[in-house]
């Protein structure tokens, strides 16, 4: 009964972000409208993350659900109204005086997310060490980047069966087991600390850093200088460069005390993007974002973007597809056993290809069927037929012959070219 109730709650959140403008297509898109089962806009075919959707509440609920039943419950709160776990995102507001002609004004900068550390100076320095265009200052390019990465790296349909399209009871059960396993074994949240604090924490826990976290070097100077000086150096696990004295580092508990990262180096092994809000998945000595960890464990449907838990699925063009989702990207007709053409890595049926994507023949001005041979040169196309690929002057068939192309026209000889230009 409980499983049936979960299936009844299935929703793709079609109301969320409805009408939001597309940041990529601009005025060409009429506004966001979620496709029935694809995770794209029905109007422009761009993803939800490409639209200007104000979704802080929904994002916080998504991350809150991710942290539910994990060791990171301190980062969530449950609303009394519905009991849904919500991410207690750390927002940092910095104020600084700005000199004015008559008075001193206060400049306020709000970060939509910041490392949850007590030392604000450490959090501020962390922000300075990541690229400026990725700093999540409210209303900035960096804030938009964070929203986009939340959607990309932590898709709701990778953790919540109710966000998926028509899963069977068995698929729901498999997905729940999969999510429970990664929450227990690989999910983690980075911690921002000074390297010496991590070393002290390791010593307090009675664990060895194997010498890779820090090395102590004694330098002997002359009598008029300091007799002995101790210098502690720490290096980044990713780039192998030293940490600067006093700069914060990112520590990942699942990776162990002997590994630290520069803030800008705490990235996914696959996509190389900053791990959003320092949420990571640790596997085989590598950091992954949620999406790419799941991709390393399960096939993902190229149609609906969901993980595949069914034993039966199809493969085409090097991609995986649910059997019911191997469909035309334009009209959604099922393509099993049908002729299709790949357009921008998306399968399109023959009818839609001819209607929406086919190039026109310079000879007859009709669309060129995908199965018909063609001649292409410098962006111009012709049917490879004696009635189409002909001299623009004398109509001689040019198939298999030398020709002279001039602005979409072709000529069999210099004489014909001169006749047309005179």
UniProtKB/Swiss-Prot annotation:
Subcellular localization, as worded in the UniProt entry: Cytoplasm, Cell cortex; Cell junction, Focal adhesion
Region (Disordered): 135-165
Domain (PET): residue spans on this chain: 92-199
SMART domains reported in the protein's UniProt record: LIM
Domain of life: Eukaryota
Family: Belongs to the prickle / espinas / testin family.
UniProt name for this protein: Testin
Lineage: Eukaryota, Metazoa, Chordata, Craniata, Vertebrata
């Amino acid at each position: 009964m409980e499983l049936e109730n979960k299936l009844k709650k299935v929703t793709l959140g079609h109301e969320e972000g409805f009408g939001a403008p597309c940041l990529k297509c601009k005025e060409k898109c009429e506004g966001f409208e979620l496709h029935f089962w694809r995770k794209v806009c029905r109007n422009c075919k761009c993803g939800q993350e490409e639209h200007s959707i104000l979704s802080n509440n929904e994002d916080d609920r998504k991350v809150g659900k991710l942290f539910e039943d994990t060791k990171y419950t301190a980062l969530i709160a449950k609303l009394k109204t519905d009991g849904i776990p919500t991410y207690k995102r750390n927002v940092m507001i910095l104020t600084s005086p700005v000199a004015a002609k008559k008075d001193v004004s206060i400049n306020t900068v709000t970060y939509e997310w910041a490392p949850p550390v007590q030392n604000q100076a450490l959090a501020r320095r962390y922000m300075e060490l990541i690229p400026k265009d990725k700093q999540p200052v409210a209303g900035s390019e960096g804030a938009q980047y964070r929203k986009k990465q939340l959607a990309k790296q932590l898709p709701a349909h990778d953790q919540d069966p109710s966000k998926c399209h028509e899963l069977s009871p068995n698929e729901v059960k498999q997905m729940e087991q999969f999510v429970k396993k990664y929450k227990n074994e690989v999910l983690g949240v980075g911690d921002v600390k000074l390297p010496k604090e991590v070393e002290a924490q390791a010593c307090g826990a009675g664990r060895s850093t194997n010498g890779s976290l820090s090395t102590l070097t004694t330098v002997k100077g002359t009598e008029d200088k300091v007799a002995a000086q101790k210098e502690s150096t720490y290096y980044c696990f990713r780039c192998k460069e030293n940490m600067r004295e006093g700069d914060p580092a990112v520590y990942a508990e699942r990776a162990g005390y002997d590994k630290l990262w520069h803030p800008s180096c705490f990235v996914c092994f696959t996509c190389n993007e900053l791990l959003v809000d320092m949420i990571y998945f640790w596997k085989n000595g590598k950091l992954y974002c949620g999406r790419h960890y799941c991709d390393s464990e399960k096939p993902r449907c190229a149609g609906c973007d969901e993980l595949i838990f069914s034993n039966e699925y199809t493969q085409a063009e090097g991609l995986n597809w649910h059997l019911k989702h191997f469909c035309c990207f334009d009209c959604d007709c099922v393509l099993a056993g049908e002729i299709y053409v790949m357009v921008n890595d998306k399968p399109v049926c023959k009818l839609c290809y001819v209607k929406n994507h086919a190039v026109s023949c310079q000879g007859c001005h009709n669309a060129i069927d995908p199965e018909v041979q063609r001649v292409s040169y410098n962006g111009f196309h012709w049917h490879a037929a004696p009635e189409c690929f002909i001299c623009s002057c004398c109509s001689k068939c040019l198939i298999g012959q030398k020709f002279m192309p001039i602005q979409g026209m072709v000529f069999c000889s210099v004489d014909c070219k001169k006749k047309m230009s005179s």
